């Protein structure tokens, strides 16, 4: 709407004006000549080359002042080159600077100027739609215009995020996903009903009033009232269990589990942010990645990465401002944008976006609290995504050759093993090994090493690494002593510095396998990506060039090892924190435990069951039922 309004107020005062003197061919003289025609109006300017290709689009609160800046010295090499290529300029005046900002971003997307930040991936995002034009509303994925009798929830970052959420919502609320035509022509329940994904409204398996209650609960969940709904379902489940309505209790338990899985899949779940996009930026060596998390109704509906075209001398503020302007040119704007970096025209951008959204839009760069943590997560994702993109830009073979060159190997390695440990003050300690080969990560070769209490001194990182490598090579020597089965590494990468490398070298010497090359990978003094130091036994530390693709490749392997190790550690820690009393009963293994929980809904319900109810469970003998009953009676 703002763009159409602006078109009525613009004046083109380009070089074709008959009273304007003929400017020199290119460069500073061209720009100097145009200054004579400009006033202090706000507007947008375009710089064009001798073939009328647009080099740059900019906006200004004062066109004359802004353009005059180009005639002064002190520009970067990129700007100097752009000026030298400029042979013509065009100007469009606007009534306000806000209009100029909106027009600038629109023209950049249309014209794709060579010297502007350019968002190349301009995709739309899907929503969840609950139809309202039917007695039994449908739940489905939706793209495109949001109109008609329906409720829309989103946006979601990807179709996958929508599909996963829909899958769990159908388990929880049993809402139909069939078309109206299919609904009207059903004579018996479909497969969705059989697998408990639909309540069967098409054949009268549920009343319209009860179905409407399920729709209401689904909408409440999507609108951010998930905790309240889960509390209500939990109370219903408890009441059903106490009334010995075990089938209903089990169904309610499954609904709670499905809703919990929706939340756990969301990763970050902010408590104090109801509607916002969290935008994190990472710039490195002339490349950029922007990560956007979509927060709606206090829920994280996924994240998406973008790779705008940038130049190496562009600042984070410049890239962030350009991204925001272009990204929201054709998308709904949330009530709040939470940014990792300040932008120069934050107030102006907020006004422009507020006009577009027809409500207040706030732009914030948090300095502390939960929002700071959310932004840090977005930046971390952006950094990791950029690292993956850079490492994938070269072929795997080329990267492996680069590894060989960097570390003085005789040939590119076919198998690289990367090791990392994870623990909290020595508790639940684990080691992780990931493997990289000619075709990428070899996930079927990953291994985890549980470090038992007493095996090493708590918190002794060197001792943990020695324990892991001792186990690894003891097994290799036993299973493949002749190194003929492709199980032996061509290179070891150790997460750590000189101390870890020395510890590993001791183990290698003890096992007589000193011929296997090893390198320690340690972050630099300020622990920044790009400043890693590398250690080999008995040698001084060395580094690689920050823009070397091999460095990104190593970072990617090191980060994957860290992810694998810390994930294993968290699983081990979670298991130790959540002890199920059924695990301690003699004769109750995984199969019978599952049967008991399925039948009663929870371990607490099992503990309250009488003997006859326990005997009724499939797979539980009379003797085992008595054992279970007696176990809980004496507790």
Swiss-Prot record:
Pfam families, alphabetically?
Answer: GIY-YIG, HHH_2, UVR, UvrC_RNaseH, UvrC_RNaseH_dom
A GO molecular-function descriptor: DNA binding
Q: Which residues form a coiled coil?
A: none
Location in or out of the cell: Cytoplasm
Q: Where is the signal peptide?
A: none
Q: Which residues form the GIY-YIG domain?
A: 40-117
Q: Which Gene Ontology cellular component annotation is one that this UniProt entry carries?
A: cytoplasm
Q: Where is this region: Disordered?
A: 1-27
- GO biological process annotations for this chain's record? nucleotide-excision repair; SOS response
Q: For this UniProt record, give its keywords in alphabetical order, as a comma-separated list.
A: Cytoplasm, DNA damage, DNA excision, DNA repair, Excision nuclease, SOS response
Q: Which InterPro entries match?
A: DisA/LigA_HHH, GIY-YIG_endonuc, GIY-YIG_endonuc_sf, GIY-YIG_UvrC_Cho, RuvA_2-like, UVR_dom, UVR_dom_sf, UvrABC_protein_C
The answer to whether the entry has keyword Cytoplasm is yes
UVR domain segment(s): 227-262
Task: Name the cystine pairs.
Answer: none
Q: Where is the composition biased (Polar residues)?
A: 1-14
Q: Which family does it belong to?
A: Belongs to the UvrC family.
The record ties this protein, via NCBIfam families, to: PRK00558.1-5, uvrC
Q: What does this protein do?
A: The UvrABC repair system catalyzes the recognition and processing of DNA lesions. UvrC both incises the 5' and 3' sides of the lesion. The N-terminal half is responsible for the 3' incision and the C-terminal half is responsible for the 5' incision.
Tell me the subunit arrangement.
Interacts with UvrB in an incision complex.
**What protein am I looking at?**
UvrABC system protein C
Q: Give the originating organism.
A: Ruegeria sp. (strain TM1040) (Silicibacter sp.)
């Amino acid at each position: 709407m703002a763009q159409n309004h602006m078109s009525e107020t613009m004046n083109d005062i380009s070089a074709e004006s008959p009273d304007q003197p003929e400017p020199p061919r290119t460069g500073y003289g061209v720009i100097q000549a145009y200054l004579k025609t400009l006033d202090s109006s706000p507007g947008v300017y375009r710089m064009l080359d001798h073939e009328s290709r647009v080099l740059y689009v900019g906006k200004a609160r004062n066109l004359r002042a802004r353009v005059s800046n180009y005639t002064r010295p002190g520009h970067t090499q990129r700007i100097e080159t752009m000026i030298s290529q400029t042979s013509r300029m065009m100007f469009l005046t606007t009534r306000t600077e806000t209009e100029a900002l909106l027009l600038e971003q629109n023209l950049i997307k249309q014209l794709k100027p060579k010297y502007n930040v350019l968002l190349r991936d301009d995709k739309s995002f899907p929503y969840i739609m609950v139809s309202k034009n039917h007695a039994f509303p449908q739940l489905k994925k939706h793209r495109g215009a949001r109109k008609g009798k329906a409720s829309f929830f989103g946006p979601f970052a990807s179709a996958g995020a929508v599909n996963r959420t829909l899958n769990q919502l159908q388990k929880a609320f049993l809402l139909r996903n069939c078309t109206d035509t299919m609904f009207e022509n059903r004579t018996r329940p479909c497969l969705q009903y059989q697998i408990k994904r639909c309540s069967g409204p098409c054949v009268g398996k549920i009343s319209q009033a009860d179905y409407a209650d399920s729709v209401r609960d689904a909408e409440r969940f999507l609108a951010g009232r998930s905790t309240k709904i889960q509390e209500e379902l939990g109370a219903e489940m408890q009441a059903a269990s106490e009334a010995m309505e075990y089938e209903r209790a089990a169904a309610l338990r499954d609904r709670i589990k499905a809703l919990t899985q929706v939340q756990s899949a969301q990763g970050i779940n902010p408590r104090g942010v109801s509607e916002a996009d969290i935008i994190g930026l990472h710039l490195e060596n002339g490349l950029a990645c922007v990560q956007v998390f979509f927060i709606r109704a206090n829920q994280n509906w996924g994240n998406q990465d973008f790779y705008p075209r940038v130049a190496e001398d562009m600042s984070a503020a410049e890239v962030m401002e350009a991204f925001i302007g272009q990204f929201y040119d054709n998308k709904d704007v949330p009530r709040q944008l939470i940014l990792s970096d300040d932008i120069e025209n934050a107030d102006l951008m907020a006004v422009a976006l507020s006009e577009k959204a027809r409500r207040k839009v706030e732009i914030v760069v948090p300095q502390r609290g939960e929002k700071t943590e959310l932004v840090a997560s977005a930046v971390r994702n952006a950094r990791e995504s950029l690292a993956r993109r850079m490492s994938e830009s070269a072929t795997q073979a080329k990267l492996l050759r680069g590894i060989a060159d960097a570390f003085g190997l005789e040939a590119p390695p076919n198998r690289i093993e990367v090791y990392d440990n994870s623990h909290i003050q020595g508790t639940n300690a684990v080691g992780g090994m990931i493997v990289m080969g000619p075709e990428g990560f070899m996930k079927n070769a990953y291994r985890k090493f549980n470090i038992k209490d007493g095996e090493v001194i708590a918190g002794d990182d060197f001792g943990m690494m020695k324990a892991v490598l001792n186990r690894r090579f003891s097994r290799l020597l036993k299973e493949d002593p002749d190194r003929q089965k492709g199980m032996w590494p061509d290179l070891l990468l150790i997460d750590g510095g000189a101390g870890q490398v020395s510890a590993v070298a001791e183990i290698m010497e003890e096992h007589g396998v000193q011929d296997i090359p090893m390198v320690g990978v340690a972050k630099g003094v300020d622990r920044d990506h790009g400043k890693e130091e590398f250690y080999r036994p008995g040698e001084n530390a060395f580094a690689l060039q920050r823009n070397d693709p091999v460095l990104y490749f190593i970072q990617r392997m090191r980060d994957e090892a860290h992810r694998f190790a810390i994930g294993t550690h968290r699983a081990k820690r979670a298991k130790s924190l959540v002890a199920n009393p059924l695990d301690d009963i003699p004769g109750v293994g995984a199969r019978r435990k599952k049967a008991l929980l399925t039948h009663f809904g929870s371990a607490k319900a099992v503990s309250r069951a009488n003997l006859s109810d326990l005997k009724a469970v499939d797979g539980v003998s009379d003797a085992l039922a008595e054992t279970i009953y007696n176990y809980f009676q004496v507790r």
